[in-house]
Amino acid sequence: QVDIIFDFINTFRKSSTIVLVDPVMGDNGRLYSAFSNETCKKVCSLARSADIITPNLTELCILTDTDFEELNSHCENDDFLERISDVAKSAFSHSEQKIVVTGIKKGNYLYNGVFTKQDCSFVKAECHGGSFSGTGDIFASIVFASVVNGESLVSAVKKAVSFIEKATADTAKEPYDRNDG
Protein backbone atom coordinates (compact mmCIF):
# COMPACT_ATOMS: atom_id res chain seq x y z
CA GLN A 1 0.00 0.00 0.00
CA VAL A 2 2.82 2.43 0.77
CA ASP A 3 4.19 1.97 -2.75
CA ILE A 4 0.77 2.84 -4.18
CA ILE A 5 0.69 6.05 -2.12
CA PHE A 6 4.21 6.97 -3.29
CA ASP A 7 3.13 6.44 -6.91
CA PHE A 8 0.05 8.60 -6.37
CA ILE A 9 2.07 11.42 -4.81
CA ASN A 10 4.72 11.27 -7.53
CA THR A 11 2.06 11.33 -10.25
CA PHE A 12 -0.10 14.16 -8.92
CA ARG A 13 2.16 16.35 -6.77
CA LYS A 14 2.71 19.88 -8.02
CA SER A 15 4.61 22.76 -6.42
CA SER A 16 1.39 23.99 -4.80
CA THR A 17 0.36 20.56 -3.50
CA ILE A 18 0.36 20.01 0.26
CA VAL A 19 1.03 16.42 1.28
CA LEU A 20 0.02 15.35 4.79
CA VAL A 21 1.06 11.92 6.00
CA ASP A 22 -0.22 10.33 9.18
CA PRO A 23 2.48 7.68 9.64
CA VAL A 24 0.27 5.08 11.30
CA MET A 25 2.60 2.41 12.69
CA GLY A 26 1.83 1.91 16.36
CA ASP A 27 0.61 3.27 19.67
CA ASN A 28 1.43 3.11 23.37
CA GLY A 29 5.06 2.28 22.63
CA ARG A 30 4.25 -0.73 20.47
CA LEU A 31 4.28 -1.39 16.77
CA TYR A 32 0.93 -2.57 15.38
CA SER A 33 1.04 -6.34 14.82
CA ALA A 34 0.34 -6.02 11.08
CA PHE A 35 3.51 -3.96 10.56
CA SER A 36 6.82 -5.51 9.61
CA ASN A 37 10.13 -3.69 9.87
CA GLU A 38 10.11 -3.37 6.07
CA THR A 39 6.68 -1.70 6.13
CA CYS A 40 7.86 0.68 8.87
CA LYS A 41 10.86 1.67 6.75
CA LYS A 42 8.54 2.45 3.85
CA VAL A 43 6.18 4.48 6.05
CA CYS A 44 9.17 6.40 7.44
CA SER A 45 10.29 7.14 3.89
CA LEU A 46 6.78 8.28 3.00
CA ALA A 47 6.75 10.58 6.04
CA ARG A 48 10.05 12.14 4.95
CA SER A 49 8.44 13.12 1.64
CA ALA A 50 5.49 14.90 3.27
CA ASP A 51 4.95 18.58 3.95
CA ILE A 52 3.09 17.83 7.19
CA ILE A 53 3.30 14.69 9.31
CA THR A 54 1.01 13.83 12.22
CA PRO A 55 2.66 11.05 14.23
CA ASN A 56 1.62 10.09 17.71
CA LEU A 57 4.42 9.77 20.28
CA THR A 58 5.10 6.12 19.44
CA GLU A 59 5.34 6.92 15.75
CA LEU A 60 7.61 9.91 16.42
CA CYS A 61 9.91 7.56 18.32
CA ILE A 62 9.88 5.10 15.40
CA LEU A 63 10.61 7.91 12.91
CA THR A 64 13.56 9.14 14.98
CA ASP A 65 14.80 5.81 16.35
CA THR A 66 14.14 7.06 19.89
CA ASP A 67 13.47 4.73 22.81
CA PHE A 68 9.77 5.25 23.61
CA GLU A 69 9.97 3.76 27.10
CA GLU A 70 12.90 5.97 28.06
CA LEU A 71 11.23 9.11 26.70
CA ASN A 72 7.83 8.30 28.21
CA SER A 73 9.43 7.55 31.60
CA HIS A 74 9.72 11.35 31.94
CA CYS A 75 5.98 11.98 31.39
CA GLU A 76 5.49 13.36 34.91
CA ASN A 77 8.57 15.59 34.73
CA ASP A 78 8.33 19.32 34.05
CA ASP A 79 10.66 18.95 31.06
CA PHE A 80 8.67 16.18 29.31
CA LEU A 81 7.29 18.42 26.57
CA GLU A 82 10.73 19.96 26.07
CA ARG A 83 12.18 16.47 25.62
CA ILE A 84 9.51 15.71 23.01
CA SER A 85 10.32 18.98 21.30
CA ASP A 86 13.97 17.93 21.03
CA VAL A 87 12.98 14.58 19.52
CA ALA A 88 10.54 16.23 17.08
CA LYS A 89 13.24 18.64 15.90
CA SER A 90 15.36 15.64 14.92
CA ALA A 91 12.54 14.31 12.73
CA PHE A 92 12.59 17.10 10.13
CA SER A 93 13.60 15.78 6.72
CA HIS A 94 13.46 19.13 4.91
CA SER A 95 13.33 22.79 5.93
CA GLU A 96 9.68 23.36 5.06
CA GLN A 97 8.34 20.24 6.77
CA LYS A 98 5.92 20.67 9.66
CA ILE A 99 5.29 18.11 12.37
CA VAL A 100 2.28 17.71 14.64
CA VAL A 101 2.86 15.17 17.40
CA THR A 102 -0.57 14.02 18.54
CA GLY A 103 -2.02 12.67 21.76
CA ILE A 104 0.86 13.30 24.16
CA LYS A 105 -0.44 12.22 27.57
CA LYS A 106 0.75 14.27 30.54
CA GLY A 107 -1.26 14.12 33.74
CA ASN A 108 -4.97 14.54 33.01
CA TYR A 109 -4.29 16.28 29.72
CA LEU A 110 -3.44 15.47 26.15
CA TYR A 111 -1.06 17.74 24.29
CA ASN A 112 -0.49 18.12 20.58
CA GLY A 113 2.89 19.56 19.65
CA VAL A 114 3.14 21.78 16.57
CA PHE A 115 6.68 22.04 15.20
CA THR A 116 8.30 23.97 12.38
CA LYS A 117 12.01 24.58 11.89
CA GLN A 118 11.56 27.99 13.53
CA ASP A 119 8.94 27.43 16.21
CA CYS A 120 7.11 25.02 18.46
CA SER A 121 3.93 25.22 20.49
CA PHE A 122 1.64 22.85 22.33
CA VAL A 123 -2.15 22.72 22.25
CA LYS A 124 -3.64 21.29 25.46
CA ALA A 125 -6.92 19.40 25.83
CA GLU A 126 -8.69 17.58 28.63
CA CYS A 127 -8.41 13.82 28.58
CA HIS A 128 -11.73 11.99 28.60
CA GLY A 129 -10.73 8.60 29.91
CA GLY A 130 -8.81 6.78 27.21
CA SER A 131 -8.59 6.49 23.48
CA PHE A 132 -11.36 6.56 20.90
CA SER A 133 -11.10 4.85 17.54
CA GLY A 134 -11.04 7.23 14.59
CA THR A 135 -9.93 10.38 16.40
CA GLY A 136 -6.57 10.39 14.62
CA ASP A 137 -8.30 10.27 11.24
CA ILE A 138 -10.65 13.09 12.20
CA PHE A 139 -7.74 15.11 13.58
CA ALA A 140 -5.67 14.78 10.40
CA SER A 141 -8.70 15.58 8.22
CA ILE A 142 -9.54 18.78 10.10
CA VAL A 143 -5.91 19.90 10.15
CA PHE A 144 -5.44 19.20 6.44
CA ALA A 145 -8.70 20.88 5.36
CA SER A 146 -7.93 23.92 7.49
CA VAL A 147 -4.38 24.30 6.15
CA VAL A 148 -5.54 23.84 2.55
CA ASN A 149 -8.05 26.62 3.20
CA GLY A 150 -5.29 28.99 4.30
CA GLU A 151 -5.27 28.66 8.08
CA SER A 152 -2.02 28.49 9.99
CA LEU A 153 -1.00 25.08 11.26
CA VAL A 154 -1.41 26.15 14.90
CA SER A 155 -4.92 27.46 14.19
CA ALA A 156 -5.77 24.23 12.36
CA VAL A 157 -4.54 22.12 15.27
CA LYS A 158 -6.52 24.22 17.76
CA LYS A 159 -9.66 23.70 15.66
CA ALA A 160 -9.09 19.94 15.46
CA VAL A 161 -8.36 19.68 19.19
CA SER A 162 -11.47 21.68 20.08
CA PHE A 163 -13.69 19.46 17.94
CA ILE A 164 -12.21 16.20 19.19
CA GLU A 165 -12.28 17.35 22.81
CA LYS A 166 -16.03 18.01 22.53
CA ALA A 167 -16.68 14.80 20.61
CA THR A 168 -14.77 12.60 23.06
CA ALA A 169 -16.43 14.28 26.06
CA ASP A 170 -19.85 13.51 24.60
CA THR A 171 -18.85 10.01 23.50
CA ALA A 172 -17.44 9.16 26.95
CA LYS A 173 -20.94 9.68 28.37
CA GLU A 174 -22.47 7.10 26.03
CA PRO A 175 -22.68 3.36 26.78
CA TYR A 176 -20.91 2.36 23.54
CA ASP A 177 -17.65 0.58 22.89
CA ARG A 178 -14.95 3.19 22.13
CA ASN A 179 -13.80 1.05 19.21
CA ASP A 180 -17.12 1.73 17.49
CA GLY A 181 -15.86 5.24 16.69
Model-derived regions, located:
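Glycine-rich beta-alpha junction loops
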Residues: M25, E59, G103-G107, E126-G129, ...
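Short, small-residue alpha-helix embedded
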Residues: I62, G129-L153, V157
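Glycine/small-residue-rich loop that forms an oxyanion/phosphate-binding "nest" at active or ligand-binding sites
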Residues: Q1-S45
